[in-house]
Amino acid sequence: MPMRRRPDLPAAIAVERPAAGAAPVVVSLAHAGRIYPPEILAAARASQPELERLEDGWSDLIASRATEAGATVVQALWARAVADCNRGEGQMAPGEVAPQLRAQFSAPGRKERAGLGVIPTRLADVGPLWKKPLDRAALAWRLESLHRPFHAALTDALEATRARFGHAILVDLHSMPSIPPGQAGHGAQIVVGDRFGDTADPWLVDAVVASAERFGVPVSRNQPYAGGHIVRTHGRPDRGVQAVQIEIDRSLYLRRDRTPDSDRLKPLSNWFYGLLQEISAAWPGAAALPQAAE
């Protein structure tokens, strides 16, 4: 792969800001991208439909009204197969990369060993995703094209929000497969993660959980998803940046063929819109802040 991104390729990142009436909320969508650059498809051993299994399919539609609620939205437009923005740059198993790169990766966790590191390399029932192990040029191209611009855009959005309001709330939105029996959190259809209190104060997590319960679905805290690289990196309650990860069961809005079910998606999108309004107003002292557009 070339080190430099071609100028004819579509944008990898989108930042959408509210047209009127802002709120101290930033929504991140790291896994909703559906663009597969030609370089990625050429390097793939797996088919595009197999690579699409990595996506948080159509989760961006859940956040379709986020800017109406006053939130800024930062979205990866390129697919997760390019790079996983919810992993750190060092999160890879040494065995998943070319020999000359192995020294820079160590102590991999369960997800990395399963091939779900910063560059996804394997999937269950598919096997290796790429024709050859990642070399230095391929890794650099992926990180420089998607991963680093995404986090730079997210940092900028949070800093601008905090500068305007004195604080910021990050909602990192994902979707998940149904949690199987025997796994922690089984039965929950919305999982709220704050890394067990590290990335958000209790009032925010309580507000998100209460809103999800009013929506009428089972909710879990931190089980089985406590929050990944995004909330761990950007959540700094002591500096005025609260961050929660929200995982939503895909069965709530997708058909079995993984296409959106508009009849079920609309109430979910409306719920998320209302949630953003609620947490904007729930911050202690928020009564003195400008209100988001209705």
Question: Regions from the language model: what does each represent?
Answer:
Residues 2-170, 175-294:
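N-terminal catalytic or cofactor-binding beta/alpha core of small enzyme domains
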